[in-house]
Every structure is written in C-alpha cells, then in structure tokens.
Amino acid sequence: MERERSHDVIVVGGGVVGLTTAVVLAENGVRVRVWNRDPAERTTSAVAGALWWPYRIEPEPLVGGWALESLAEYEELATRPEETGIRVVEGVHRGMSLDELGPWAARVPGLRTADDGEGLAALLPLIDMPVHLAWLRARLLKAGGTVEERVVTDLARVPAPVVVNCTGLGARELVPDPAVRPVRGQLVVVANPGVTTWFTSVDHSSDTSTYFFPQPGGLILGGTAEDDAWSLEPDPAVAAGIIARCAAVRPEIAGARVLAHRVGLRPARGAVRLERLPLPDGRALVHNYGHGGAGVTVAWGCAREAAALVGAAA
C-alpha cells in the first residue's frame, strides 16, 4: 500500500541543500516537489570541490552539529562510492591545529596532528558532486518526489501549504536578503598525474588558497574566495596562479593537462538562515539558505532541521 502522504511542500532550489532537504521530507512521507531554475548540474553545488569540512560558514555552535550529522550520513554512503559519488579519502589540512577548532572536531574520526607536525591529517568524505546530485535526484524520485524546472520570482506565490526556500545566493533577490553575498571560487580540473590524497592550505586573510582533491573525473585544483565578486568567467591569470601554488606542493601537477575551468559563487551570509515564518495568507515559509562554502558539509543536518520546521508548520 502506498504510504499516506501528509501534506504538500514545494522546495525552491535544487542544489545539494534543496535536494537533500527534499529527500528527507519525501522519506518522511511528505508529498514534495522541487522547483529549480536550472538543472542540478548547472548549480553552484555542481562545481564544488567538494570535501566535507566546515568552511566559511557560521554560526559555529550550530554548524558543528549539522556537519557531524552529515558526516555520519556520508560515511555510510561511502560504502557505495560508484552509486553515491562519495569516497572517504586521506589528506592533510596544512597550517591547521586542533586547538583552533570547535568542540565538533573531537568527534571527527581519525582527526589528528599530521606526521610532520604542520597541520591536521584526517580521513574525510570527498564528494563527486555531479554524481552525488544525480544520486540525490534519483533517491528523491524513488521516494515519490518530483523535480521541475520553474522560475520563482515571489516565494509567497508558490502554490503549496509549506514553501521551503533553499535558493542559496538567489535568496539575495528573492527574499530579498542583502545579507547574502557572493564569494567567488575558481577551480582548475587537470588530468590526475597520480595524486591520491587531498590537501588544503587556507589563509583566511587572503582571497587565494591552495588545495587539491582527487576526483574520478580529474584532480580538482583550487582556489579563490573573492568577496562580492559576481563574474562566472574563468580568469586565466588566476588559473595559472592556482596551478603554480598546487605544483609547489606536488611538483607533478605542473605538467598535468588542463581538462576544465570552473567558477562558482558561494552563498555567504553572516549566519545560516534556518527558520520558519508565516506567509501573508497564513501558509508557512521555511528558510534554509546561507551555507557559504559548506553546503554539502551541513546538508543533511540542515535538511533534518528544516524538515522538523516543516512538520511543526503542518
């Protein structure tokens, strides 16, 4: 017998946060539709690196819990990497120490000081985003949800008893919320010359950093974090700098064949907005946006909290 469906929800936004939220709702028995302006493969989520780690996201006391919930989910999904796009991979955060992290870090399995004493070593989920987004969509459809390409210009006109706003940077104009700002990230994808571990070295006082993530489709090199920059066009000089910084860590990267350039705009905000509000006609609006550079890192934790808010609104 088909599960009894409780009520209708439309999730606006089909990146990793929107799709994960929709999956949680659908598997809780909610009749859910995702409305997205662009297909998932053209969202910011699709161009992410994407390593599980709280990066450029606040508030830390809440982020830690959301991230750990997501970590547990990804560790289970990593048992089926070809299907889910998730693998657990070893790597090093250079220049980072345990005492600068929040209480959540004590619950990350295997997180330790690196052997050379110059950072933190860990086994962390590395997500192949195009594969993972396709898997989330398939899981949603299996649970009875639907995905539709729709352009939304007014959240109050979305025809559902509960509307969930997962529009990321789009919330700046749609809500409107001027606290949402773009942080431009540029990446270079190269043919992997044999790198099997990830690496990051991030200077939060600079708009450039150094990291590389081995993905099935190539080695992802980064990166940048340019506040209030809107351009989606790759900058050749920036790309050359990215390759040079990564090659200073692993010299074999210098001669690797370039496969692609990627640019994404992280939806930065002073704090994630995760709350329920009434619409003018009494229906409910649940906001779940502003995840900065850590949407995939907190996706499951935020999705479950958003689902609880939806349930409270029913």
Predicted regions and their residues:
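Core beta-strand elements of the Rossmann-like FAD/NAD(P) dinucleotide-binding domain
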Residues: 5-7, 156-162
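N-terminal Rossmann-like FAD-binding beta1-loop-alpha1 element of flavoenzymes
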Residues: 8-33
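Flavin-dependent oxidoreductases
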Residues: 20, 160-244, 249-257
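Glycine-rich FAD pyrophosphate-binding loop
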Residues: 27-46
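Short beta-strand to alpha-helix junction loop
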Residues: 59-69, 119-135, 233-238, 297-298
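Flavin (FAD/FMN) cofactor-binding and adjacent substrate-gating region
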Residues: 72-144, 268-269
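C-terminal catalytic lobe of FAD-dependent flavoproteins
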Residues: 135, 256-314
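A conserved short coil-to-beta-strand element within the FAD-binding core of flavoproteins
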Residues: 145-158
